[in-house]
Amino acid sequence: MRVLVTGGAGYIGTHTMLEMLAADSTPLAVDNFANSSPVALERVARLSNRKFDHTEASLTDAPAMRQITEDFKPEAVIHFAGLKAVGEFEQNPLTYYEENVSGTIQLLKAMDAVGCKKIVFSSSATVYGEPQYLPYDEVHPLSPVNPYGRTKLFIEEILRDWAATDPQKSVMLLRYFNPVGAHASGEIGEDPCGTPNNLVPFIAQVAVGRRDRLKVFGDDYDTPDGTGIRDYIHVSDLATGHVAALNYTSRHGGVEVVNLGTGRGQSVREVIAAFAKASGRDIPHEIAPRRRADIASFYASTEKAKLLLGWQARLSLDDMCRYVWRWQSQNPEGYEYG
């Protein structure tokens, strides 16, 4: 299957590309490399022992996207591309809406131009907002608490409207929880630009000596140890979930929503302890005030993923931390200097 992968050089994109290549798909990675590196794609090619094409383009560049789809003629799309940093989002929302929402519209127009009717969208559990109950299932009310989550929700609604125009169109909305981990080889992993926004990459940079200490934002939540609880899912499990979703969309029309998580919550303190064990190093940390709009507990119901896709997460928190440490210790400065 010819699959166009937007954001294919990114953290989740590269791991999914590896799984797709192993499944004999023919991917084309499209990335503007604003928050990623071409080196990541070189490593995917080396690890898979497969050649594949990639091109540099922004989704908001309508002529470029039209040309790419006309040349490649994708049978399906996996859509990862988008800006993410929540703090920057709140400072500069229009740029993020343009990149994420307008970029998706241009992508769909380019797909329509060549009759491509299948798309798997990298959505997010942030669309749920504050829990009305736990675990979150796919029918939980939607009320995102930050602009990033709102863009994901807007795109979900756009994709629903797009799918409604043709019964042969198929959309899979994958709402995933907290991706962590790295490839078992240590060759590809999460390489954030600037200060990491996510917990585990920050811990890894502390462990390798790039940063002095970790700030734990709040230890007074209504949780067993007072720190926030999240559903951490290994990126390699997430990648196999995308391949399962791609297979489903190739056989079915309409719109489906599926959570990708482990169904288990882990606290910040538990993650720190697991990473210290994996790395053999202390993780200096200090308690800081809660961040605005942070949620105490956040974890998935995974029943639909099992029933619809035949998929479930298999790797543990210890696996996640061990693979991240392998990646970070082999690539202390990320891709450019690894």
Question: Which residues does each predicted region cover?
Answer:
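N-terminal Rossmann-like NAD(P)+-binding domain of SDR-like oxidoreductases, especially those catalyzing
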Residues: 1-182
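The catalytic Tyr-centered alpha-helix of NAD(P)H-dependent dehydrogenases
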Residues: 30, 144-151, 192, 196-199, ...
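Glycosyltransferase donor-binding loop in the core domain
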Residues: 60, 84, 96, 195, ...
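A general boundary/transition motif marking the beginning of the first structured unit of a protein
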Residues: 112, 190-195, 293, 312
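Oxidoreductase cofactor-interface core, primarily capturing Rossmann-like NAD(P)-dependent enzymes
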Residues: 174, 185, 213-216
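Short, basic/glycine-rich phosphate-binding loops at helix/coil junctions
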Residues: 181-183, 220-221
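Hydrophobic, Gly/Ser/Ala-rich alpha-helical and linker tracts in large acyl-processing enzymes
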Residues: 184-196, 203-206
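C-terminal substrate-binding subdomain of Rossmann-fold SDR/epimerase-dehydratase oxidoreductases
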Residues: 199-338
